[in-house]
Amino acid sequence: MTGNEQRRPAAEGRLAAVLHRWDDEAAFAAGQAAGTAWSGGALRLTAPVGRETYADPFGHGSLDWEYGSWTSPWAAMPFAATDIVPSWTADAPDGARITVRLRIRDTGGHESGWYVMGHWSSGDAVVHRATVPGQSDSQGHVDADTFTAVGHGVSACRLQVVLAREAGGDVDVALRGVRAVASRPPVGATPAVSGPGGAWGTVLDVPGRSQGAHIGHCPQWDGGGEAWAGPACTAMLVEFFGRGPGAADLTWLDPDDPAPQVDFTARHVYDYGYKGCGNWAFNAAYPARYGLRGAVVRLPALTDVERFISAGLPIATTLSFRSSELSGAGQSAAGNIMVVRGFTTGGDVVVNDPLAATDAGVRRVYPRAAFERVWLSGDGGGGVAYLLHPEGTALPPPVPGEPPRW
């Protein structure tokens, strides 16, 4: 879509969402590269164009880095968006990092400066991955992984990714894909519960991992328990695809840990700026080390989730709710993440809910109407989900006549 195309109003009462993605050679060729080039299935730092000193505020001090960059073209919105969440797939081992930036154009025609949406490295020995607090101006503000517009809606956005490595080093840093999901909350009456989407009676065999089994673990990475819904769900998804850390990666953990891969995941998704493990983009980025692509998306109905279940792909959803709003939950959650693994023959939602006390108790079934209402509500989840898939896996076809959402 070009910047001159007319924006179509989103359906009343329905979450509006669109995903802009750049994840192959042709897509990256449409942007502006500086010191980076496509090679071996990724955009790589090949000829650094500058040096900078980056001061890590979380303990590693200042280091000199050499860098290149890639800047996307402007991506127009089919509606006036209020929120944007970038996500990415990148190879950035110790000694490398990427910085993801966002610029918006509002419906009044004004362009913003660059917002920093994250400094990312898959390890933590050289630099700490972190978002940047305190970014706010007349056009919007950044809260960890999410940009929220103020005043005017967003008519277009662009992303810039800086690929950096320690000056004089030879670490390979590569960008395999970058995305931006933009959304607008529902307007008007709450839509009726969605009907069948093709996956009723399909339940995927996703291993169960409880965050409750890790209470008190690794306090430097938020201490397990209620804080580890993201790591538990991400570990489940990675394990579903037969991937994950090996025994040699886990030697620093307690040998009696019931599921050390959850602790490992928590360490490697922890956002030192946000001081937590719930950064959606970081959870979607972590699995790149195992050859998995991840993306943060927003979906307006469970019928979209059913498309992924039918394709054999479980998906993580984020919800906030009071216990009275979700029958069977047994407790309230200010910000939980659950893996949707399928649907009953009657259309109710089969999940792995990591709030359970043990791995054996995570499988639960929630009423379709209640789950969908909570997940889609503006204060309950806003339709946020993140998905993982192996390189080369075909995703479900887009919904005809609607903006792409994955």
Language model feature labels by segment:
Residues M1-A10:
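Actinobacteria-biased recognition of intrinsically disordered, low-complexity terminal regions
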Residues G13-L63, A76-F79, T99, I104-W114, ...:
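Noncatalytic regulatory segments and standalone regulatory/sensor domains
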Residues L19-R21, V162-G276, P403-W406:
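Active-site-adjacent structural segments surrounding the nucleophilic cysteine of cysteine proteases
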Residues W38, G59-L63, S72, L253-R405:
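Conserved active-site-adjacent core of cysteine acyl-enzyme catalytic domains
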Residues D64-S69, A80, Q139-H141:
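Short linear interaction motifs
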Residues W65, F79-A81, G95, A227-P231:
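Short, surface-exposed loop/turn motifs at beta-strand boundaries within globular domains
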Residues F79-P93, V161, F321:
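A short beta-strand element within beta-rich, extracytoplasmic domains
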Residues P93-R101, A334:
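Short coil-to-beta strand junction motifs in C2/discoidin
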